[in-house]
Structures are given as structure tokens and as C-alpha cells.
């Protein structure tokens, strides 16, 4: 059984989700949001780093899936998102976690079956797959979807010795 951390990065709200992959489906462990407040960007990035570090310490995942940066309409927003991703990746790398990155389309395809699914469709499918009674917050739901996507990809890659994945900078590119 493998504990998987999913991260939906953001400079103001970073969603997280932890699931246990037992090979025949995943079990919900925890989810929530790291809210960084209205401080300066360095303070918010530090809050993301510390929050992810605490989640790793509390739950002990061995691997992490994180969403890749998408092309935002605003270049400044994309840069801040990339910096928040970096803070989360450094926290995971320091803890020795295996890190894999997924596009939003890959996550939606793995969870809903359509790369064009909206956030509510993803949220409802996450609830169904993890047998949740209450709706998780949207950012937490996205993070749980990333964790589930990572579990799915790990299952499909393990029998092949991760031959289908490329390592770049210590991270798996799928």
C-alpha cells in the first residue's frame, strides 16, 4: 500500500489530497487547502513550502503528483503559479518523495474520461471514486484527482519498470 500526495498548486490557495493506493482502488486519507494569506509573494511561497512539508511529515506519503503549469491569460499569474509549484516540489524533494507531473488534461482524462471536463465533473467523480459523503473544496478536489491520476499511472507503469516514463531533473515526465 502506497501513500500518494496530490498537489494543486497556487500562490494563494494550494490544494492537497492524500490517498492510499492498495492496488485495487484508492482510499481517502486527507485533503484540504493551504491558504497563504495576503502577505508578500516570498511569504506566501514560504507558507506553501511549510504547508507541504507539514503534510508530508503528518501523513508520510512516498510519492507526489503535481499539476504542471498551464498557459494562463496573464503571464504574471503563470509565473506565480510556477513559483508555488517550485515551493511544493522542493518540499517533496527534500523529503525524498518520487515526484511526477501531470497536465490538467491528463488528470481530467484519467478521472472523468474527458480532457475537457469541468471542475464540478472532476469533483463529482472524485467523490464517487473515493466514496466521499461530502464535497471536498474545489482545490482539494483537484488535488485528490491528481493523486488518483498518479495512482492510475503508477499502476500502468510499474509492470513495465517505468519504461514509459522519462526522467528529467529527478522528476517523472509522463
Swiss-Prot record:
GO molecular function: crossover junction DNA endonuclease activity; DNA binding; magnesium ion binding
UniProt-listed SUPFAM superfamilies: Ribonuclease H-like
Catalytic class of the enzyme: hydrolase
Entries under InterPro entries matching the protein: RNaseH-like_sf, RNaseH_sf, X-over_junc_endoDNase_Mg_BS, X-over_junc_endoDNase_RuvC
Enzyme Commission identifier(s): 3.1.21.10
A GO CC term attached to the entry: Holliday junction resolvase complex
Protein residues bound to Mg(2+) 2: 67
Catalysed reactions, as listed in the record: Endonucleolytic cleavage at a junction such as a reciprocal single-stranded crossover between two homologous DNA duplexes (Holliday junction)
Pfam families: RuvC
Quaternary state and interactors: Homodimer which binds Holliday junction (HJ) DNA. The HJ becomes 2-fold symmetrical on binding to RuvC with unstacked arms; it has a different conformation from HJ DNA in complex with RuvA. In the full resolvosome a probable DNA-RuvA(4)-RuvB(12)-RuvC(2) complex forms which resolves the HJ.
Functional summary from the UniProt entry: The RuvA-RuvB-RuvC complex processes Holliday junction (HJ) DNA during genetic recombination and DNA repair. Endonuclease that resolves HJ intermediates. Cleaves cruciform DNA by making single-stranded nicks across the HJ at symmetrical positions within the homologous arms, yielding a 5'-phosphate and a 3'-hydroxyl group; requires a central core of homology in the junction. The consensus cleavage sequence is 5'-(A/T)TT(C/G)-3'. Cleavage occurs on the 3'-side of the TT dinucleotide at the point of strand exchange.
Record protein name field: Crossover junction endodeoxyribonuclease RuvC
Protein species of origin: Azotobacter vinelandii (strain DJ / ATCC BAA-1303)
Amino acid at each position: 500500500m502506497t501513500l500518494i500526495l496530490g498537489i494543486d498548486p497556487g500562490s494563494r490557495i494550494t490544494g492537497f489530497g492524500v490517498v492510499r493506493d492498495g492496488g485495487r482502488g484508492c482510499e481517502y486519507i486527507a485533503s484540504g487547502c493551504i491558504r497563504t494569506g495576503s502577505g508578500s509573494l516570498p511569504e506566501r511561497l514560504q507558507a506553501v513550502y511549510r504547508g507541504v512539508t507539514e503534510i508530508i511529515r503528518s501523513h508520510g506519503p512516498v510519492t507526489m503528483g503535481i499539476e504542471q503549469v498551464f498557459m494562463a491569460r496573464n503571464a504574471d499569474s503563470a509565473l506565480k503559479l510556477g513559483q508555488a509549484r517550485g515551493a511544493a516540489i522542493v518540499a517533496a524533494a527534500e523529503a525524498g518523495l518520487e515526484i511526477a507531473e501531470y497536465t490538467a488534461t491528463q488528470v481530467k482524462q484519467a478521472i472523468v474520461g474527458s480532457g475537457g471536463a469541468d471542475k464540478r465533473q472532476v469533483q463529482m467523480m472524485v467523490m464517487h471514486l473515493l466514496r466521499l459523503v461530502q464535497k471536498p473544496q474545489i482545490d482539494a478536489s483537484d488535488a485528490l484527482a491528481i493523486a488518483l491520476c498518479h495512482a492510475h499511472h503508477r499502476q500502468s507503469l510499474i509492470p513495465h519498470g517505468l519504461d514509459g516514463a522519462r526522467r528529467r531533473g529527478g522528476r517523472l515526465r509522463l
